[in-house]
Amino acid sequence: MLTYETWEENDVSFSEEDETKGALSALSWAYKEYKSEIVYACSFGVEGMVLLHLINQVNPSAKVVFLDTNVHFQETYELIQKVRERFPSLNIIEKQPKLTLDEQANLHGNKLWESNPNLCCNIRKILPLEESLANEKAWISGLRREQSETRKHTKFINQDHRFQSIKVCPLIHWTWKEVWRYVYKHSLPYNPLHDIGYPSIGCEKCTLPVGEGGDSRDGRWAGKVKTECGLHYQ
């Protein structure tokens, strides 16, 4: 089994010639390699809808973790319920931070997402994912190379130094148009915020719509140097 500790530059490759551009093959490999010791960390963005549909074909009882920061859009929570109805066998876990919003405010002040967004993300996303991955050998992410400069070198199989794990990224070769084409073809549910200018959807406090021609992640932490929550730093 390929693990963080036994990592070596691997020659695992998947054909990009099929409809899924290697995604289905990557997922099949991942679940065969790690069996029950792998989890999909899903934010329920549109890429997530594609991955959930593919994962359901490979492993209908797969573990899926949603990092519930308690400040997501209502539309996101409603989408999760629709996904549960569409894929009832998937094991969707809504992972909570250890601190409630009130406890966080008492310790660090009100609106931490404004005063110190890195600390807020650490408390409400990074630490919960660390806990979720503690007993796993690998995790799945919906990163695409097209999304941003920080993601353009992502591989199918990655050594993840942040969480000392293996990160599997099946959608690296997909374009934004291909994601939507797949969603429409298979009549998948998706967050209606995508229809009103939100290409990337995170917490309600830190996500704004993006103007025409903008980068897909321009609406995340707008006005701040921060462009990533920290889950995908190497």
From Swiss-Prot:
Reactions catalysed, as given in the entry: [thioredoxin]-disulfide + sulfite + AMP + 2 H(+) = adenosine 5'-phosphosulfate + [thioredoxin]-dithiol
Q: Output one GO MF annotation.
A: metal ion binding
Q: GO annotations under biological process?
A: cysteine biosynthetic process; hydrogen sulfide biosynthetic process; sulfate assimilation, phosphoadenylyl sulfate reduction by phosphoadenylyl-sulfate reductase (thioredoxin)
Question: Which GO terms of the cellular component aspect does the record hold?
Answer: cytoplasm
Where would you say this protein principally sits, based on its record? cytoplasm
The listed locations are:
Cytoplasm
> Would the keyword Ligase be found if you checked this record's keyword annotation?
no
Q: Which cofactor does it need?
A: [4Fe-4S] cluster
Cofactor: binding details: Binds 1 [4Fe-4S] cluster per subunit.
EC primary class: oxidoreductase
List ligand-binding residues for [4Fe-4S] cluster.
120-121, 203, 206
Q: What InterPro entries has UniProt attached to this entry? A: APS_reductase (IPR011798), PAPS/APS_Rdtase (IPR004511), PAPS_reduct_dom (IPR002500), Rossmann-like_a/b/a_fold (IPR014729)
Pathway where this protein functions: Sulfur metabolism; hydrogen sulfide biosynthesis; sulfite from sulfate
The UniProt transmembrane annotation reads none
Tell me which residues this entry annotates as catalytic.
229 (nucleophile)
The EC number(s) given in the record are 1.8.4.10
Database matches in Gene3D superfamilies: HUPs
Q: Which Pfam families match?
A: PAPS_reduct
Sorted UniProt keywords:
Cytoplasm, Iron, Iron-sulfur, Metal-binding, Oxidoreductase
Which HAMAP family does its entry note?
CysH
Please explain the role this protein plays, according to its UniProt record: Catalyzes the formation of sulfite from adenosine 5'-phosphosulfate (APS) using thioredoxin as an electron donor.
Q: Which PANTHER family match?
A: PHOSPHOADENOSINE PHOSPHOSULFATE REDUCTASE
Family the UniProt entry places it in: Belongs to the PAPS reductase family. CysH subfamily.
Q: What is this protein called?
A: Adenosine 5'-phosphosulfate reductase
**Natural source organism:** Bacillus cereus (strain Q1)
